[in-house]
Amino acid sequence: MTENIHKHRILILDFGSQYTQLVARRVRELGVYCELWAWDVTEAQIRDFNPSGIILSGGPESTTEENSPRAPQYVFEAGVPVFGVCYGMQTMAMQLGGHVEGSNEREFGYAQVEVLTDSALVRGIEDSLTADGKPLLDVWMSHGDKVTAIPSDFVTVASTESCPFAIMANEEKRFYGVQFHPEVTHTRQGMRMLERFVRDICQCEALWTPAKIIDDAVARIREQVGDDKVILGLSGGVDSSVTAMLLHRAIGKNLTCVFVDNGLLRLNEAEQVMDMFGDHFGLNIVHVPAEDRFLSALAGENDPEAKRKIIGRVFVEVFDEEALKLEDVKWLAQGTIYPDVIESAASATGKAHVIKSHHNVGGLPKEMKMGLVEPLKELFKDEVRKIGLELGLPYDMLYRHPFPGPGLGVRVLGEVKKEYCDLLRRADAIFIEELRKADLYDKVSQAFTVFLPVRSVGVMGDGRKYDWVVSLRAVETIDFMTAHWAHLPYDFLGRVSNRIINEVNGISRVVYDISGKPPATIEWE
């Protein structure tokens, strides 16, 4: 019998802040399970979830507007601690009898709050002291409205010159509000405040750890599928790889992985996937060489979105054909992770701002009545990686840079041809190898090479040549929503360029992309 790792749980109500998923990740980092729900949940849903505590997130709306979101009244009647962050504090104050006003002055960026009153939330937590010995906290503010009167049964815990109620508390009811964002690293003691709330005030045990998550997932897979057979599309990416390892641990040879080699992978990637999962870990893998099929389907197509659709469609066709060859498979496994679940829920309700449509393996043949197994669907990406390490997958594989689902299909601009893919693979491998050698790979968030379908004149020896151009791209980002181009050293870029032009016959020029996001996207297509 595995331990119930969901026993203590925090409910986070999302009012639309860009940082809300970060709040959830911070709570998970503290070893406590949490879920992220839209703000307008019902009393019955909250009762059913039975949280140990509730966090009200920040959000872009103004509580002074008539139809702005409000926390369900039951939040304040459930008898559990409540922590309001930024907008969450404002709606708490307003709903419990305080007052909020719009302000002409937005407070955005660093601020120092002075702790005036002892509180369980910040006791013993400080960044520095005032001349008369009062604790000061360095925090990150991002708000326009502010609380101008707190509810009568609350006390002011901390303030700044422009924000008289930076922290408010009702210690008896264990209700706390902060006008800043404790979840961002700029609030230096933010993690300690969250820990104080989650672990001490809500009294949650740290049961959410990689080893226990694995035990729980294995037990749940066995309970769900029993002795049935399961099929998984293994791409070699982080999510499908960790899914494969979890399923293999749970059901062994009853798992069949289908690895579709579409000819759009990185250099030697197909061989590496087969060696690692087949030979080293002993998984049951069907290797489907399908390069010709993908490239002929892509022939003549220049439009990026059309290329994505073609690659997706052909993948599903190939996967379906392989699935039909297997006898008695009852379950399809997918590497869906928690942000995918949040995005789909948001697109279904229209509440959050969906950035992209997410595609996992879809469109199985109608004659295949299969159940769905999604062992990662409660996990954030950083948690998936930690679990992968615990399961024995190599660090370099788990922490390598993102690679798009359509692969080189969207890194070869315009029409995709085998010749272009082969040149790009070799150029990209040199760039990545040099980044690793220079200890720069982990210092950038993503780096790759793009094939440009234009020829340029070059000189090699005594002769002229007329060959292709590639662009190097490297960015630094925290969340991939915005990004800066990476300021790689000139001598490093020169070395990479020299190697590519000398070692990859067919490329005569290398350029470096210095566009930020926005206005450019990270990928070119």
Swiss-Prot record:
Positions in coiled-coil regions: none
Superkingdom of origin: Bacteria
Sequence ranges assigned to domain GMPS ATP-PPase in this UniProt record: 208-400
Residues where ATP binds: 235-241
GO cellular component: cytosol
Assigned keywords, A-Z: ATP-binding, Glutamine amidotransferase, GMP biosynthesis, Ligase, Nucleotide-binding, Purine biosynthesis
Transmembrane segments: none
Keyword Endoplasmic reticulum: no
Record-linked NCBIfam families: guaA_Cterm (TIGR00884), guaA_Nterm (TIGR00888), PRK00074.1 (NF000848)
Stated name of the protein: GMP synthase [glutamine-hydrolyzing]
